[in-house]
Structure formats: C-alpha cells, structure tokens
Design a protein with these regions (language model features):
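Compact, glycine-rich, soluble single-domain proteins
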Residues: 1-106
C-alpha cells in the first residue's frame, strides 16, 4: 500500500474529487483533518481515521455525496472501498512497536 500525503492547499482542497478512480494499492493521507466529504467523487471510499498515528475508527464503503467526521482523529486516510485492511497493515508495518519501557514513536 502506497500512502500519498495531501500536504498542499490544492491537494487538500481537491483531494480525490473528479477522479474516475484511485489506483489499487494507493491511498491519500490528510494530516490535521477531522472531517471529509465525498461530493464530486465517482467511487466509494474506506476512511481510516487516525489519532496519534493509530487507527481510531474505520468507515467502510462511504459513497459519493456524503460527509463524515471523527472528533477523536487528527488525520484521515482515504482509500478505495475494501482497502481499509491494507491501509491498517501498512500503518503497522511502517511503525515498529515500541520496546518494553519505551513510549511509542510519535
């Protein structure tokens, strides 16, 4: 799973709106984001809400024309419907577990 970061104003504003699809195995991360909409979308999404880099909620199969938010989140990952599991696996792979007695990595 390739996680692409929406880190410019333009990519955050446009996101995936208007695209016919998102290539399988790719997802878009929106840092500092607690609410998203799927207006202008042409396909359903899985939303993986993150708090401190860890999944706090997953909304599966969010169809176009919807609004979702998660107060517990500080970021969200948008992926093709059905790919939330791959996103979570990639997040775990990218963040090794803390050693006993250490705090998890930020």
């Amino acid at each position: 799973m390739e996680l692409l970061v929406a880190d410019s104003r333009l990519t955050r504003l446009v996101g995936l709106a208007g695209r016919r699809s998102l290539p399988r195995g790719r997802a878009l991360v929106f840092p500092r984001c607690r609410s998203v909409h799927t207006f202008g979308m042409r396909f359903a999404l899985d939303l993986v809400w993150l708090g401190g880099g860890e999944p706090v909620r997953i909304d599966r199969g969010v169809r176009p024309g919807r609004v979702r938010s998660c107060r517990a989140a500080d970021s969200v990952v948008e992926a093709n419907a059905g790919e939330a599991g791959a996103v979570v696996a990639e997040l775990k792979r990218a963040r090794p577990p803390a050693r006993p007695g250490e705090s998890p990595a930020p």
